[in-house]
């Protein structure tokens, strides 16, 4: 992997991770276009690990932006902020469904859904769903009072967590499902976005840690059977590329998150629905014209 490739992948990760357009789908397409992860099973294993580990940069960006909530939860743990403790329990409730489903179906998802056609399908279905929801809201405006983050209950958080499980299908978008879930249970736009970002920190941290600790199962070079996935990735791509990708993800995620909150409050999700349908159509056309294989 060249440095410019790790920089580009980091920018893609940071920009798309918290937008409702699927970072996983974009990274799969970008890696295919650059020929990364296509040489052997071990190369693909390392590429998948790289894509997950640079999420650490995006995690740091959200921790910095939402340090107030993080501090609140830390104070809650030592009994000094009941609201912070409640928020922490709500995040755990939202995280548990994905943790259980992820542990059970992780390998099946990697084996069957990490292809271009599954990504294209989820991009387009999700885009149409967003546009249909926007149309419905215009015809049936919701005038009821909305909940702020402090009024979220663990039962409602669990519903958001169940919807997050759908995003394990690459291309669906974890942010889309959790923001939509937050709006569904009655949160304000700002509260839904904030909960989505904070839940993302917990979910992505767990996914990154699991990848770093997992044993490689690729049927490639012999070292893949003796070292963890993280070491396999570093052997293939080097520490410098991981650092470049992580820093690029952190900076771009910081800017994307700051922009998204205000944008959604002013304009809603429609543009993301249009984008998802458009990029799904473009990638489908590239596959059908054999520009690259599915």
Each language-model region and where it sits:
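Multi-pass membrane proteins that catalyze or facilitate reactions on polyprenyl-/lipid-phosphate substrates
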Residues: 1-294
């Amino acid at each position: 992997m060249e440095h410019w490739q790790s920089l580009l992948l980091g920018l893609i990760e940071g920009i798309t991770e918290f937008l409702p357009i699927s970072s996983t789908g974009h990274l799969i397409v970008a890696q295919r276009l650059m020929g990364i992860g296509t040489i052997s099973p071990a190369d693909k294993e390392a590429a998948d690990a790289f894509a997950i580990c640079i999420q650490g940069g995006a995690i740091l960006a959200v921790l910095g932006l939402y340090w107030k909530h993080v501090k609140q939860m830390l104070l809650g743990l030592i009994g000094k902020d009941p609201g912070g403790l409640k928020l922490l329990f709500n995040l755990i409730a939202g995280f548990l469904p994905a943790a259980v489903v992820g542990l059970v179906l992780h390998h099946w998802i990697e084996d069957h859904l990490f292809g271009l056609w599954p990504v294209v399908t989820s991009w387009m279905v999700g885009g149409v769903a967003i546009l249909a929801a926007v149309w419905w809201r215009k015809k049936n405006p919701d005038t009821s009072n909305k909940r702020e983050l402090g009024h979220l209950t663990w039962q409602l958080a669990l519903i958001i967590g169940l919807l997050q499980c759908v995003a394990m299908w690459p291309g669906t978008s974890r942010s889309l499902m959790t923001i939509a879930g937050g709006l569904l249970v009655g949160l304000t736009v700002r509260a839904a976005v904030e909960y989505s970002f904070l839940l993302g920190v917990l979910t992505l941290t767990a996914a990154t840690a699991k990848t770093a600790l997992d044993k490689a199962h690729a049927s490639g070079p012999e070292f893949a059977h003796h070292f963890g996935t993280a070491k396999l990735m570093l052997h293939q791509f080097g520490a410098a590329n991981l650092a470049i990708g992580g820093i690029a993800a952190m900076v771009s995620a910081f800017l994307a998150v700051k922009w998204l909150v205000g944008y959604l409050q002013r304009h809603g999700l429609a543009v993301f629905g249009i984008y998802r349908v458009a990029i799904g159509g473009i990638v489908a056309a590239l596959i059908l014209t054999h520009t690259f294989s599915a």
